[in-house]
Design a protein with these regions (language model features):
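Short, flexible helix-loop junctions that flank or precede catalytic/ligand sites
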Residues: 1-220
Length: 220
């Protein structure tokens, strides 16, 4: 992902449901390339994270500051990197693709369930596959899950029912590569004083990254 953010132009999308940490991920990507030499502009609704060195604009519909109007201004000003908080409509998506094809690195978010489904979503929005296939560098799908407490977590031998659940999703061959010689072992946390007896300590992001190479572009 860091290699993708270092590209001079193209489009990177972070996808997932509301509350899955997409905005935080976008700012982490921007933070990786945020240097004095780069002109980085954002349009967000609202601005949730302030980051020094960026020119951050917030949507204010009452005075016609929208994703679309901001993108039109951005393209005239020619920044190096553009962050669009969310591609909500066809016009914003079209301008995002145009920007990424004309020498800008663009990062944005979209509400889809997985990285491959994003291709279908863009097509359903009316985007031409030949255009966005050339623009796309990668799609990062993510979810936030609870993290087990590191103080009280313990491993245990998985039950037959739990093992069958893993086989159903992964298949026997893939599961065998993840299993130790003593069999499938999982983790659980009964709770302790450190985690206030919840068994959990914060959340962690799970990611699915689709890097768009020539083969995938041809398929699109």
């Amino acid at each position: 992902l860091t290699a993708l953010t270092e590209q001079p132009y193209g489009m990177i999308l972070a996808v997932g449901p509301t509350g899955s940490g997409k905005t935080t991920t976008l700012h982490a990507m921007i933070g990786h390339i945020n240097t004095r030499e780069r002109k980085i502009w954002t349009i967000e609704d609202p601005v949730e994270i302030r980051q020094p060195g960026l020119r951050q604009l917030q949507v204010v519909r009452e005075v016609d500051v929208t994703f679309q109007s901001a993108m039109r201004s951005f393209l005239r000003a020619d920044p190096d990197v553009i962050m669009v908080g969310e591609m909500r409509d066809v016009e914003t998506a079209s301008m995002a693709i145009e920007a990424s094809l004309t020498g800008h690195l663009l990062v944005s978010t979209l509400h889809t369930n997985s990285a491959p489904e994003t291709i279908t979503r863009l097509t359903d929005m009316g985007m031409e596959p030949f255009a966005f296939s050339d623009a796309l560098l990668g799609i990062l799908a993510q979810r936030l899950v609870k993290r087990l407490c590191g103080k009280c977590r313990e491993d245990y031998a998985a039950s037959d029912a739990e093992r069958e659940e893993f086989v159903r999703y992964l298949g026997e061959e893939r599961l065998s590569k993840l299993t130790r010689s003593e069999g499938l072992r999982l983790w659980r946390a009964p709770g302790c004083q450190d985690c206030e007896y919840t068994g959990y300590d914060g959340r962690v992001a799970l990611h699915e990254l689709l890097v768009v190479n020539d083969e995938i572009r041809q398929a699109i």
